[in-house]
Amino acid sequence: MAPAAASLTAPNALAATSLPFLHGRKSGGGGVSVHAGAPSPSRAVAVVARRLWGSASSSRRMVVAAATAAEMAPAASGEEGKPFVEEMRAVAMRLHTKDQAKEGEKEPQAPPVARWEPSVDGYLRFLVDSKLVFETLETIVDRAAVPWYAEFRNTGLERSEQLKKDLEWFKEQGHTIPEPSAPGTTYASYLEELAEKDSQAFICHFYNVYFAHTAGGRMIGKKVSENILNKKELEFYKWEGNLSQLLQNVRNKLNEVASSWTREEKDHCLDETEKSFSYSGDLLRHIFT
């Protein structure tokens, strides 16, 4: 979504890669254009996640939210009838801090980037859990228990094969590849559950996981690569073809699918945003803990 500088706080960067959010569009010069989306007037986005995650949960949400502000494509004004993807971006903006986006409502809770101490072991845990999540999303749309899931097959955004190659590379370097951990298995199980019984909530996660990775996720990948991988660019951060067009194709499909939803169904999808932030934040924490 000349690029505006992202706030250099830990939540900013972490949010960037957060599998949910960070919905960027490339500008003509190759950068990411930055505009905050206006939220739908009906959204009171203090949203639904009623699980008692306490302060840790709040911290996870901040980690995920951060870089979205630097990567968000422009959203229309709050009038009814605008493309639904823009409503999804607008809701995500509300989970930012004020210094990240004018619509932000959260307090900053993470240390500055200078205090980051990423490790290869932690990054491997993140990659392994991310691979499981992407595999789960790909399996769900391939299986298409809900017929319109098939619209999201072979979008060009799929990441599991790229992650498989990256993990093979780490193995060749002598690193032990861990098994998926609780954050990854828990999120994958939740996605499977949603896919069967709550298609609107599922599509919220689908959208945020993929769009977050193409924007803020790359920011985090670059930072980690510079710190611990001697600037090696992983396959996880490479796409075939025109990424901007791949993203626009998915936006169009999402808007088309949502055009048949009731207002209640759309709101239910939007209400899942905070959970998406939280689950993705759990994965990101691997990198810095």
UniProtKB/Swiss-Prot annotation:
Its EC number is 1.14.14.18. One of its GO terms (cellular component) is chloroplast. Heme b binds at H96. GO terms for biological process: heme oxidation; inflorescence development; photoperiodism; photoperiodism, flowering; photosynthesis. GO terms for molecular function: heme oxygenase (decyclizing) activity; metal ion binding. It catalyses: heme b + 3 reduced [NADPH--hemoprotein reductase] + 3 O2 = biliverdin IXalpha + CO + Fe(2+) + 3 oxidized [NADPH--hemoprotein reductase] + 3 H2O + H(+). Keywords: Chloroplast, Heme, Iron, Metal-binding, Oxidoreductase, Photosynthesis, Plastid, Transit peptide. Disruption phenotype: Pale green and very early flowering phenotype and complete deficiency in photoperiodic response. Lack of photoreversible phytochromes and responses of coleoptile elongation by light pulses. Pfam families: Heme_oxygenase. Its main location: plastid. InterPro entries: Haem_Oase (IPR002051), Haem_Oase-like (IPR016053), Haem_Oase-like_multi-hlx (IPR016084), Haem_Oase_decyc_pln (IPR016951). It is an enzyme of class 1 (oxidoreductase). It comes from the Eukaryota. SUPFAM superfamilies: Heme oxygenase-like. It is found in: Plastid, Chloroplast. Gene3D superfamilies: Heme oxygenase-like. Residues 1-64 form a transit peptide. Belongs to the heme oxygenase family. Catalyzes the opening of the heme ring to form the open-chain tetrapyrrole biliverdin IX with the release of iron and carbon monoxide (CO). Is a key enzyme in the synthesis of the chromophore of the phytochrome family of plant photoreceptors. Essential for photoperiod response and repression of flowering through cytochromes that inhibit flowering by affecting both HD1 and EHD1 flowering pathways. This is Heme oxygenase 1, chloroplastic. It comes from Oryza sativa subsp. japonica. The gene is HO1.
